[in-house]
Amino acid sequence: VFLVGYHSGVGEASANMDHSYGGRTFHDVRINGKYMNESTINSAYAGYHGVPVGLVIGDSALQKQLITDGMMPWVEFVKTKDSLSMMSAKFRPKGVLRQETIEAVIKVLDGDYTSLPVYKIDAPYTLRIEFNMRTMFDFAMLLPGAKAVDGRTIEIHFDDYEELFNGVMAVCYIVGMAYPFDAPRR
């Protein structure tokens, strides 16, 4: 699996696109107590199916999370831009980025697939999501199995990662409907 166009998860300093699925909704996502971003949630889904992630293409803030901070230090990574702040980034030259991407793809495809680690999380799974706003929490509490941790955080337990993955998607869509209720009024 190649993950293309990814960004850091919520809260990474200097990140210009930090979010996890629902940029307006999710404040923190954890599986079995471990901080997760879109890259690791999706990599665990690939891992559930026995498929490794060989390449990630994304910004410097994600590179810090995956490589420097050790979330997935083995993965081949191509940095698309240097994130400077929430509203700014320094993009790399298109020609350089194209060449680095070609080289990374060739390196992964010419390598030994069987030596690539498969990103897995052991079952059973506890999904914990903290929302940006209370109304989002209220909508999420309508989901079967959702338990309140506090006024903005839910937990749902799963035995199967595919069900967890679908649960993340369902939560994202359901709480997205809450956004207009919490939007600033004029």
What are these regions (language model features)?
Residues I31-A140:
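Glycine-rich, Lys/Arg-enriched anion-binding loops that position phosphate/diphosphate groups
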Residues E100-R186:
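C-terminal accessory domains and tails appended to enzymatic cores
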Residues G5-E12, M36-P52, A178-R186:
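Charged, low-complexity, helix/coiled-coil-prone segments
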Residues M17-S20, D69-W74, P144-K147:
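Short, solvent-exposed amphipathic alpha-helical segments in soluble enzyme
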